[in-house]
Structure formats: structure tokens, C-alpha cells
Amino acid sequence: MTRLSIAPASADDARIGGFLDRQKRRVDAMPPGMCPLAQQLTLLEEGALQTCGKCVPCRDGLPQLAGMLRHLVDCQADAAEVERMRALAEMVRDTSDCAIGYESANALLEGLDAFAAEVESHVSKHECQRSVGQSVPCETFCPAHVNVPAYIALVAQGDYAGAVQMIRKDNPFPTACGLVCEHPCEQRCRRTLIDAPLNIRGIKEFACEHARADQVPVPKRLPATGRRVAVVGGGPSGLTCAYFAALMGHDVDVFEERKQLGGMIRYGIPAYRFPRERLDEDIRGILAVGGITVHTESPVDAARMAQLSADYDAVYVAIGAQTGKGLRIDGTDAEGVFSAVDLLGRIGDGDYPDFTGKKVAVIGGGNVAMDCCRTAVRAGAEEVSVVYRRRISDMTALPAEIESAIAEGVEMITLQAPAAIEKDEQGRCCALLTNPQMIGPVKRGRPAPVAADKPQMRIPADVILIAVGQNIVSAPFEEFGMAAEWGEFKADEQLHAQMDAEALAARGADASAGANVFVGGDCQTGPASAIKAIAAGKVAARNIDHMLGFNHTLDCGVEVPPAQPNDRAAYGRVEVLERPARERKNDFDAVEVPMSTEEAMQECGRCLRCDHFGAGACEGGRIQYA
């Protein structure tokens, strides 16, 4: 019998492992603006490289497909070759023996359909579409398109006030985004090619820590235009629109239903994540522009909306998604069952709950659920659990929020779907009954749960918080004539509100009524992030300005520092730390500890200044962009 031995890892295997790690980092840092067909080609060539060669369709078909796609990327293919490529891809997909062949071919077919306009441009115009061109990844992926390299360079120079002014050129909530932004700007940071993406949010937080938003001078307001703009909703989107419209010289009135400004970043985010005094700094900075009049505790119904549309030159509706969705299960009317959105809203006005000695169950897996469970811990709950019908990896909450909740003692009960709420004799909730789930087929990009053949679970609970989504209060605005669908107002790309002809006729309004109404933020997109709401407010202000016959240009008055040589040595990423869990879970004080000056300077030094190096380069049929 032949003896067995443990084969040592070869040097080639180690080198290949290192190469694959580099390849993964390159994919992670794929810049925006690349030709999608070129990306398809990269994927297809990788599939051809991986083929084992045992089946002809995969072994011979994939290299042929790669050659045909290369012709198309180089703008040398005609329509007939595209059709031959499609037919060959269908054959490879249908006859390959393994996933390498049929998945590679299927991905190509999906790409040809998804990027049909790009294919047509390569064939008929012999160039990529105008939307293709290397851009600065962080600035492109920021919904508000903040000039990230510029303010990082200003922080590196120690000009913290200049950095805040640079941020405010596109985003008047620098402090909010320094503390609670989901930082999509970091997704494709080119620094990933070397080590890890920059901690952009942490640098912004550091800048706002050293130059408070209400102490940094605001830009000078442009000459008055005599035009009036009404903003319905004093949240991040509404206040952003008000800020930019006022800077352009328009007079703005903000109508807010609640006692205080801030919207869902005041009434939906707990103080331990975003201290209220820091939010007030941003708001004071916005109002310092002048020309903005605030009306709090001023709800807007259909009649008042009609009056605003008649009295003002433009109206921007940004009411947010301020109500919680319910669950269609028995027992939701029990005492002790609360909407997570309502609970956080009361906390926003300083009405903190007392859960001392109670068992709290939170239903949901998003950021609101994490905010609720961590709030319950601070409110003195004896036990806190999050009940979710999928896995932890499927939760939509930020991974850092999940990790922090677990560190503070929250139990994650996964693959359990709420079935009913059990009441005691006094009508109070005493337990949550759940049906076990197992992970099933992938639907809409993630695995869907299906019922598992296991007994029902009983989770004791004195308080149950429902955090399964948010809705808008659309009825008054629909009565006015604004069109809504699936709980969201409808608008075009310029955020002009779409009007419902039948609703307008029902109230005897002219068909042109509402032509000056814009809508944006969560009430138009569905619940999203603060930075997306801010971006909508910026877009609305710009388009309102155009509608009123102007084309104002705003300047923050700060020069972008020149790019400095960078040795590009690999460094670890500086993370923003939190206070120890055993300490922070006992109060509502800020949990994050901002970077030190040394940490911030090191992190700023990692910036590759993509605004100066590597932007605009092109090849093949790609158009040169400056």
C-alpha cells in the first residue's frame, strides 16, 4: 500500500494566492465611469482562463466569445458580429457541463441586454457613450458629489475651517455626515489597490470636531432675486434646498410639522450616535446664510398646499418617511407594542423610555432596528434581542452597527419570522411567537427565507418594538394633486412632482396646477440615507433656480491645495473607535471617539489625490475627459 504524505504548499501556490488577492482588491476598487463592455470582457477572459477543457463549448467557446467581445470593445464589430456572438453565447450557456461555462456565457448575454445602448454606440458611432469616462471614485459615489480629495487636502494642511467650507459647497450638513453617513464614497476608493480605502467619514468628523459648523463663516448670499420658495419639511433634504436656494438670493420659508428642525436625523437617530447639540451646529450654520424663515409646528394639508403653490414661485416637498410600517400578525394592539419610528421620534423631543428590568424584543434587521435595540439597552432593559427572519449577513444594517449592538449585550435571534404577539390577562404583551425559517432561493439579489420544519419558538418579551420599514403621510398631498405610487411621490429626474389629473379635477384645479412643485428625499425615493436626502435637496434647489430663470454659480471661496508627491507606501487604515461597551451602554453620550491629530494626518496622507492623478485617462473608443 502506497504511503500517504502531507504535501507542503508550493511557492507557486503562494504567489498565485498573492496575485488573486491583488486581483480582488483591483475589482473592489473598480473605478466608476468604466466602459461596461470592457468590464464584461475582463469577466469573460477570466472564465476562459478557468476552464478545465473537458467540454468543448466551454474550452473552445469562451475564448471565441472573448475575441468577439474584444472586437466590440475596440469598436471594430458590426451588428452581424454582435448577433453571431449572441448565438454562440446561447449555445455555450445551454451545452456547457459546468458552472464556469454557462455562468460566463449567461453573464455575457445579460450584459448585452443590460447595456444595449452601449453596444449600439460601439457599433454605430465607434465610441463609448458620453457617460463613460474615468472620474474621481469618492466624489462620484457621494450622492451629493462633495469634493472629497479637496477637503482631505485642506485637513492635511491644518485648515479645518476651509475643509468645512469645502464640504458645505455641496453639503450643508458636514457634522451629520461626519457622524452618521453611510459613506458610499469609500466603496471604490483607489487606495484599496494598495491597502484599504480611506476612512473618509472619520476625516470629516475630525474636521468638524476642530472647526464647528456654526463657527465657520458661511458663503456670502447672492443679491436678492425677489423670488419666494416654500419648503415643506425641515429635515436634511428640505433644509439643504433652503440653504442653497437662499444662497442664490431667493427668499425661503420652511414649514415644519414638529417642534424642532432636523427631520429624521433628529427624530430617527439616537443621541448616542448623533448628539443633538452637534445637529444644532449644522442647523445654525444653515440658517446663518439669511433669507430663511422657519415655521415650526406648521402642518401642511391639501388646502394649505394649494395656497403655497399659488403664493410662492416654487414649492419643494420633502416630508420624509416619518411613520413606521406595521406587521400583519395577531396581537399588535397589545400594551407594550410600539412602532420603532414613533419611539425614536419621542426620544427626539427628549421623551426617553424607561425599560428598567424589562425584556425587549426588536423585530427587524435594519439600522432603525439597531438604533432601537441599543436604545433599549441604555433605557435599562434586562434583556434585549433582535428578531430577524433572515441571517445576520442578510441584515441591511451597517455591519459596524450590528457589531456594536452585540458588544453591548444584544442577542441576535435569526431565521425566525414573527407569527403572533402573546398577551397576558391584562392585555399586555408577554411574548413574541415566531415561525422558524431556513434560507432559500435567491430573489432580488439575496436569499429569501422559507418556512422550516421546526416547532414554533416563544420569546418572552415585556416590550416589542416593530422596526420593519417606514411610510410617508401622503394623503394630504395626494388630495392636492401630487401623484404617488407604492408609498412614494412620483417625480421626474429634475424632481418636478408628477401631478394626478383626476385629483386635480376633483378639487376643481387647472391642469397646470402644481407645475411649480418639486419633491425629493425619502418621500420620493423611499427610506434611504441622510446623504441621499441631502443630494435631493441640492438638486431641487438647482432646478428651482433654473425654473425661475436663473443660473447662479456658488463658490465656497476656498482654493484646493496642490497635490503633493506620495510615496504610496502601504499603511493600515485608521478606524474611528467607540468607547468601551461596558461604559457606553449605560448612557446616551456620544459613543465615537474622534481621530487624534496624528491619526487624522496619517489617514489624510494616504489619499492618492485622484482629482489630480488618474482621472480622465482613456483607451480604445473611450472619449478623453478633462
Regions found by a protein language model. Give the residues of each.
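FAD-site-proximal beta/loop scaffold in flavoenzymes
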Residues: 335-358, 442-527, 560-563
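A conserved FAD-binding loop/helix module that cradles the flavin
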Residues: 372, 523-551
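N-terminal Rossmann-like FAD-binding beta1-loop-alpha1 element of flavoenzymes
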Residues: 227-253, 369-377
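Local cysteine-cluster metal-coordination motifs and their immediate loop/turn environment
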Residues: 45-67, 90-107, 130-150, 172-193, ...
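Redox cofactor-anchoring modules in respiratory/redox and cofactor-processing assemblies
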Residues: 1-129
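Feature captures the FAD/FMN-dependent oxidoreductase FAD-binding
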Residues: 223, 228-232, 280-329, 420-432, ...
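Rossmann-like dinucleotide-binding cores of NAD(P)H-dependent redox enzymes
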Residues: 251-254, 258-285, 289-296, 347, ...
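Glycine-rich dinucleotide-binding loop and its adjacent helix/turn
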Residues: 206-223, 284-297, 301-302, 324-379, ...
